[in-house]
């Protein structure tokens, strides 16, 4: 039996993870569930999975959950705050931690799990975007195992030889015969929208992804392709890739989730339905394969698979992310922080869709880069970039 902490259990990845757990009660049990404010969903999950701990990041939500559970004969202890998130991520009874908290808030609990040598199923992009080198070095130092859950990185992982899989963060792609990682992206809902119309895109249009079911923030990131930019940065750290070893390509159908091109001309691709239960099941069961509930591809119905080069005029946020990737961890931390604030402002109707790029660009242009050698430095840059982004949004909204 493998015992799990699910960080972000009420979100899209968390729901899919619990679906896999539900299908394999003989293999997986839940020690802890965490969420921000989703009291009703958390209560339902506590009644079904009987976790030892339920953590609500929001204190008022924790109080509400405790009151809601009071009438039930559960031994679930309700906790709140960042320290509690780190506590359940590092708990001695936990074998696997699903790191699925969206945003910078997921960094500290993911690092807490790493420092206790856990198997970390990494769905939180920001852990690597903000602290890639520190995070991978810590995983090596504490003998923690990282398994990528993002569909693209999980696909790349599956297409790599065993020696590269076992040395994430330090693998030598060239020695493994790899020429290039091909990171695929659908291009989002505005792939064919005229550039002149992008400034008038609404939040409702931006969150309507053509292929994937995702949360609102990640859906907007997919529309700007900032999501692919963050994945580009992740790929650099996970697979120890050089600038010449990663390429982004548009693949509208989202059937091929990414590819690895080898020196001999071979290209290995991982294919499947656009359903996150597939990479989650792969990571949970690794190195074995477990049922995910996802129906296999019917190749008689797949039809055309097409590929397009990236148009950086259409996706300037992706260009910013790639540039930040090679500028250093200070730049990627600032990029991520400014983007989180800008996307939230867009979803709240404070700025337009194309102004997300404007805010992020302005923050990156003005923020003084500092040496990054510890988490405190990263969090300081994160805070400064968020403040600057708020200030720029205030000026844009006037």
UniProtKB/Swiss-Prot annotation:
Top-tier EC class: oxidoreductase
Annotated EC: 1.1.1.267
GO biological process, one term: isopentenyl diphosphate biosynthetic process, methylerythritol 4-phosphate pathway involved in terpenoid biosynthetic process
Catalyses which reaction(s): 2-C-methyl-D-erythritol 4-phosphate + NADP(+) = 1-deoxy-D-xylulose 5-phosphate + NADPH + H(+)
Cofactor: Mg(2+); Mn(2+)
InterPro entries tied to this protein: DXP_reductoisomerase (IPR003821), DXP_reductoisomerase_C (IPR013644), DXP_reductoisomerase_N (IPR013512), DXPR_C (IPR026877), DXPR_C_sf (IPR036169), NAD(P)-bd_dom_sf (IPR036291)
Residue sites binding 1-deoxy-D-xylulose 5-phosphate per the record: 125, 151-152, 186, 209, 222, 227-228, 231
Keywords: Isoprene biosynthesis, Manganese, Metal-binding, NADP, Oxidoreductase
Transmembrane feature ranges: none
Gene3D superfamilies attached to this UniProt entry: 1.10.1740.10, NAD(P)-binding Rossmann-like Domain
Pathway: Isoprenoid biosynthesis; isopentenyl diphosphate biosynthesis via DXP pathway; isopentenyl diphosphate from 1-deoxy-D-xylulose 5-phosphate: step 1/6
HAMAP family according to UniProt: DXP_reductoisom
Entry similarity comment: Belongs to the DXR family.
Official protein name in the record: 1-deoxy-D-xylulose 5-phosphate reductoisomerase
């Amino acid at each position: 039996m493998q015992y799990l902490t699910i960080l972000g259990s009420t979100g899209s990845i968390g729901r899919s993870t619990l679906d896999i757990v539900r299908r394999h009660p003989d293999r997986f049990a839940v020690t802890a569930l965490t969420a921000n404010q989703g009291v009703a969903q958390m209560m339902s999950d506590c009644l079904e999975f009987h976790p030892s701990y339920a953590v609500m990041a929001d204190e008022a939500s924790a109080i509400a959950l405790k009151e809601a559970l009071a009438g039930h004969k559960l031994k679930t202890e309700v906790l709140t705050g960042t320290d509690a998130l780190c506590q359940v991520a590092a708990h001695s009874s936990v074998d696997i931690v699903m790191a699925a908290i969206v945003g910078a808030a997921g960094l500290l609990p993911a690092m807490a799990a790493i420092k206790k040598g856990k198997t970390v199923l990494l769905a939180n992009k920001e852990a690597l975007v903000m602290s890639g080198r520190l995070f991978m070095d810590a995983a090596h130092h504490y003998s923690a195992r990282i398994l990528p859950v993002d569909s693209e990185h999980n696909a790349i992982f599956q297409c790599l030889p065993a020696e590269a899989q076992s040395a994430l963060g330090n693998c030598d792609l060239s020695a493994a015969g790899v020429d290039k990682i091909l990171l695929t992206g659908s291009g989002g809902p505005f792939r064919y929208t005229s550039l002149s119309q992008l400034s008038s895109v609404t939040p409702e249009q931006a969150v309507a992804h053509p292929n994937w079911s995702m949360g609102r923030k990640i859906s907007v990131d997919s529309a700007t392709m900032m999501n692919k930019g963050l994945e580009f940065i992740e790929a650099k750290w996970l697979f120890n890739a050089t600038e010449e070893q990663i390429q982004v390509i548009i693949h509208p159908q989202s059937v091929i989730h990414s590819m690895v091109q080898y020196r001999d001309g071979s290209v290995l691709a991982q294919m499947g339905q656009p359903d996150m239960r597939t990479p989650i099941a792969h990571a949970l069961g690794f190195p074995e394969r477990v049922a995910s509930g996802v129906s296999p591809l019917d190749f008689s119905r797949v039809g055309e698979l097409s590929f397009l080069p990236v148009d950086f005029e259409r996706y300037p946020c992706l260009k910013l992310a790639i540039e930040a990737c090679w500028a250093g961890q200070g730049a990627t931390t600032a990029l991520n922080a400014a983007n989180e604030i800008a996307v939230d402002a867009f979803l709240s109707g404070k700025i337009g869709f194309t102004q997300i790029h404007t805010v992020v660009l302005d923050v990156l242009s003005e923020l003084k880069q500092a040496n990054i050698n510890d988490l405190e430095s990263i969090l300081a840059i994160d805070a400064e970039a968020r403040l600057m982004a708020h200030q720029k949004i205030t000026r844009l909204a006037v």
